[in-house]
Amino acid sequence: MKTLIRKFSRTAITVVLVILAFIAIFNAWVYYTESPWTRDARFSADVVAIAPDVSGLITQVNVHDNQLVKKGQILFTIDQPRYQKALEEAQADVAYYQVLAQEKRQEAGRRNRLGVQAMSREEIDQANNVLQTVLHQLAKAQATRDLAKLDLERTVIRAPADGWVTNLNVYTGEFITRGSTAVALVKQNSFYVLAYMEETKLEGGRPGYRAEITPLGSNKVLKGTVDSVAAGVTNASSTRDDKGMATIDSNLEWVRLAQRVPVRIRLDNQQENIWPAGTTATVVVTGKQDRDESQDSFFRKMAHRLREFG
C-alpha cells in the first residue's frame, strides 16, 4: 500500500511540475512574442550635410573629425583673396555708375528746365532715356556687388548648430566645388530612436507610452517616450506594370508576415553618452508607466533578458 502511495505521489508531483513548467513556458512565450518590443531599433539624429555655396581652394581647415563644435564656429575657409578681388571690382563698378548717374541726372535736369524753347523734344527725351539706362546699369552693378559680398562671406563655412563633425573629408589645398558635401554635422541634443515594430505589437506602442532602450552589447537601459508612429509604409506586395496595372505578388493564405512600422522614441536624457547614430538597440514599450523591476516575476525577468538573444 505504501509503495502504491509513493508511486502515485511521485507521478502526481511529476505531472504538477510538468504542468507548471508548461504554464511558465507558455506565459514566457506569450510575453516574448506578443508584448510591444523589438530588437530592430536604431539610434538616429538630425544630420546636416554641410556643403559650400562657393567653389575654390580650401585655404584652412579649423576642425578635426568627430570634434564637438558650437553654432557659428568656423569649420573651414575657401580662397578668400579671389572673392575679395571680385568684391572690389564690383564696388568699383558701383562707384563708376554712381558718378555717371549723377552726371546724366544733372544733364537731364538741365535740358528739362530749358524745355523745347532751347532744344528739340527729341534731345530732351534722349537725355532722360540715357539717365534711365545708367540708373538700370547702376542697379545691376549694386546687385553684382551685393552678390560678390555674399560670396565673400560664404567663403567662411560655419557650423549651423551645436554638434559633432563627422566624416570630415576635406583638407587644406584641395579644390572644392559649390554644392559638394564636405562634412556631416550630427546635431547635439537631437538623438532619438527609431524602433521598427511589427504591426501586431503597435497596439501597445501608442504615443506617450514609456519605453526602455538597451543598446546592443550593453546592459545600460535608457528611458524614453514614444513620440509618434509612422502613418504608412511601402506595400512590397503590390507594384505597377508599364501600363499602370496593379501587380500583386502570390501569397500563402496560412502564412502572413507582419509588416514593420517605424516608431519614433524620444530619449529622456540627451546629456548622457548617447550611442552613435546608426547603432542598434532593443526597445521595450512598458506602457503608460515605467516598468517596476522589483515587481517582475522570475519568468518575466527571464523573458525580458531573452530578448537580447533573439
Curated annotation (Swiss-Prot):
Forms an efflux pump with AaeB. GO terms for molecular function: transmembrane transporter activity. This is p-hydroxybenzoic acid efflux pump subunit AaeA. It comes from the Bacteria. It is a single-pass membrane protein. The keyword Nucleus does not apply. It is found in: Cell inner membrane. GO terms for cellular component: plasma membrane. Pfam families: CusB_dom_1 (PF00529), HlyD_D23 (PF16576). Keywords: Cell inner membrane, Cell membrane, Membrane, Transmembrane, Transmembrane helix, Transport. The chain crosses the membrane at residues 12-32. Belongs to the membrane fusion protein (MFP) (TC 8.A.1) family. Coiled coil: none annotated. Its main location: membrane.
